[in-house]
Curated annotation (Swiss-Prot):
SUPFAM superfamilies: L28p-like (SSF143800)
Protein name listed in UniProt: Large ribosomal subunit protein bL31
Quaternary structure and interacting proteins, as annotated: Part of the 50S ribosomal subunit.
Alphabetized Pfam families for the sequence: Ribosomal_L31
Cofactor annotation comment: Binds 1 zinc ion per subunit.
Family that this chain belongs to: Belongs to the bacterial ribosomal protein bL31 family. Type A subfamily.
Keyword presence, Transferase: no
Annotated function: Binds the 23S rRNA.
Essential cofactor(s): Zn(2+)
GO terms under cellular component: ribonucleoprotein complex; ribosome
Annotated source species: Aquifex aeolicus (strain VF5)
Organism classification: Bacteria, Pseudomonadati, Aquificota, Aquificia, Aquificales
GO molecular function list: metal ion binding; rRNA binding; structural constituent of ribosome
Keywords: Metal-binding, Ribonucleoprotein, Ribosomal protein, RNA-binding, rRNA-binding, Zinc
Length: 68
């Protein structure tokens, strides 16, 4: 790699609203505040609720429409 053309990476602390914190390398540096992370997002935390309309559409799709 060429020297002097790549940005400097600094340790950056990411703080979530749920209290989870983690540190990564980033060009920004300092602290970044997040609304959600993998610990509190419903999809990753297993709290995602699928609405009944989804099941209705799925049943219609799997059953197929009868053409007359």
């Amino acid at each position: 790699m060429k020297k002097g053309i790549h940005p400097e990476l600094k340790p950056t602390t990411f703080v979530c609203g749920c209290g989870n914190t983690f540190t990564l390398l980033s060009t920004k540096g300092g602290t970044v505040y997040l609304e959600v992370c993998n610990q509190c997002h419903p999809f990753y935390a297993g709290k995602l609720k699928i609405k009944p309309a989804y099941y209705e559409m799925l049943a219609e799709f799997e059953g197929g429409k009868k053409e007359e």
